[in-house]
Amino acid sequence: MTKTLPKDFIFGGATAAYQAEGATHTDGKGPVAWDKYLEDNYWYTAEPASDFYNRYPVDLKLSEEFGVNGIRISIAWSRIFPTGKGEVNPKGVEYYHNLFAECHKRHVEPFVTLHHFDTPEALHSNGDFLNRENIEHFVNYAELCFKEFSEVNYWTTFNEIGPIGDGQYLVGKFPPGIQYDLAKVFQSHHNMMVSHARAVKLFKDSGYSGEIGVVHALPTKYPFDANNPDDVRAAELEDIIHNKFILDATYLGKYSDKTMEGVNHILEVNGGELDLREEDFVALDAAKDLNDFLGINYYMSDWMQAFDGETEIIHNGKGEKGSSKYQIKGVGRRKAPVDVPKTDWDWIIFPQGLYDQIMRVKADYPNYKKIYITENGLGYKDEFVDNTVYDDGRIDYVKKHLEVISDAISDGTNVKGYFMWSLMDVFSWSNGYEKRYGLFYVDFETQERYPKKSAYWYKKVAETQVIE
């Protein structure tokens, strides 16, 4: 049976400032930790990225032509405050006014994120969100943006608090490149959630028009053997690290007893302690019912086996299938069923996981109000032929995920839109320029854009709301 989506559904494309803009030092932009970190550790940098800083009119014109009626954009904090605080950079402010005006001219609704992995270097080197002073700097930055950019109707505080803590302090693939420090992971999650809560409360108390929410990456976690209680426990603990701790903070305003029992077990095995203060919970509680929407970024699921050996995580950054490894002492190890497909980067393709995650949010956090799927897509080493890419694998991936969204809506959840990652090809934080996701192919040498086969398919779905 052919499935459909609602008439008012947003068919969007997603971007992020650092991955798309380029122009990393242009017009007074301050440095971010990634600038030096990529130079020192990877085979690519954020120059030129997709040159969105200059070419956004082209991308927005393409969006209009191809039925994309929403775009996720992030503001580069260091374009507004080059050192994260103090003097405002007027050229940065002017740039985003121009960008948002172009969005509205092209009838593409901007969903604007304040922080997408790019804390200004001055604050990052001073502890990033482990340093509570930076909570204040973030709230001040948020307040300036709310006041200044009144043309924005949809605000997101943070993109993927989970993967930030994970990338910075567990896997170590994000600056500062620390590995296996689970106390820092949870503290980063917590402090960022307090920052989110305070910004949301400020937005509502100040009476700004528009909506505000947060974007969480929610990879679904399953036990490898559902009949083995140790595997079930491993999946629960892994879910706490990546999902439940953050969702509790967002919608309960506290951490449930079950969540804290899991956190305490993880820290008992791996060391470290948390600084959770009474005023933090006052802030979390005050914001828990104020979120207008939840953004869910979903790419993959994981299956977990019990594991008590030594922690070891190997990140597959170059698309060498089977080279990744993930095992955490006292938590578990990832072990996928043999029949579940994977990408070259070992990302598991499992649309059912998105359905299960949406239904989980509805069941566990009934005050969620509404959901946007704010990122979903397939990274590929695209082959450019005949001035396009015949990306049938990507079409199939997106189609199957749209179908389970349709199912979730039929089953009583309020899902209002979908943003494909990514609108055009951008560079990937820890995989470089080889891993492409876009609807529009970017020749990074010439910065020319070419619609892929998926763009024509997506246009038809957006026009008809019929998934076929």
UniProtKB/Swiss-Prot annotation:
InterPro entries: 6P-beta-galactosidase, Glyco_hydro_1, Glyco_hydro_1_AS, Glyco_hydro_1_N_CS, Glycoside_hydrolase_SF. PROSITE patterns: GLYCOSYL_HYDROL_F1_1 (PS00572), GLYCOSYL_HYDROL_F1_2 (PS00653). D-galactose 6-phosphate binds at residues 19, 116, 159-160, 297, 428-429, 435, 437. Keywords: Glycosidase, Hydrolase. The active site is at residues 160, 375. Its EC number is 3.2.1.85. It is an enzyme of class 3 (hydrolase). Pathway: Carbohydrate metabolism; lactose degradation; D-galactose 6-phosphate and beta-D-glucose from lactose 6-phosphate: step 1/1. It comes from the Bacteria. It catalyses: a 6-phospho-beta-D-galactoside + H2O = D-galactose 6-phosphate + an alcohol. The keyword Cell inner membrane does not apply. One of its GO terms (cellular component) is cytosol. The keyword Hydrolase applies. GO terms for biological process: lactose catabolic process via tagatose-6-phosphate. GO terms for molecular function: 6-phospho-beta-galactosidase activity; beta-glucosidase activity. Belongs to the glycosyl hydrolase 1 family. This is 6-phospho-beta-galactosidase. The gene is lacG.
